[in-house]
């Protein structure tokens, strides 16, 4: 697999010829001075059109919450919606060799599920509940407690 692909327009055909999955990200980077304004944003779609399996990455623990938004942003620049979802679910599980255990809702797989009040790739959507290994995770923490206390 190739990792941290973000500014690779000049070599897209070569990357595709390698026939390996590509970890893209983050796509929030500004273009280089000699790139089009949408070079980084359209990269996932360009790779997909060349038959490359893609996965989005955050490269930092605090930014992992933004993976769905990276996928959503990529759909605005040509990546098909279903492929964007795969890039943050089953594709990631498959390239790490755990696709038989994680990454999709299938019988016999670990039940890791995010329940939201809308489109999971939309920044306006709120996560309502998370299940990890089939167990509901508390949706409160110190930040939500402070918010609730001081919003009264």
Task: For each feature predicted by the language model, list its residue ranges.
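Catalytic beta/alpha-barrel core
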Residues: 1-8, 27, 31-33
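Polyanionic/metal-chelating signatures
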Residues: 8-11, 126, 132
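His/Asp/Glu-enriched, well-ordered alpha-helical/loop segment
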Residues: 13-116, 125, 136
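Extracellular/periplasmic ectodomains of large secreted or surface enzymes and adhesion receptors
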Residues: 49, 129-152
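Small/polar (Gly/Ser/Thr/Ala-rich) solvent-exposed segments
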Residues: 120
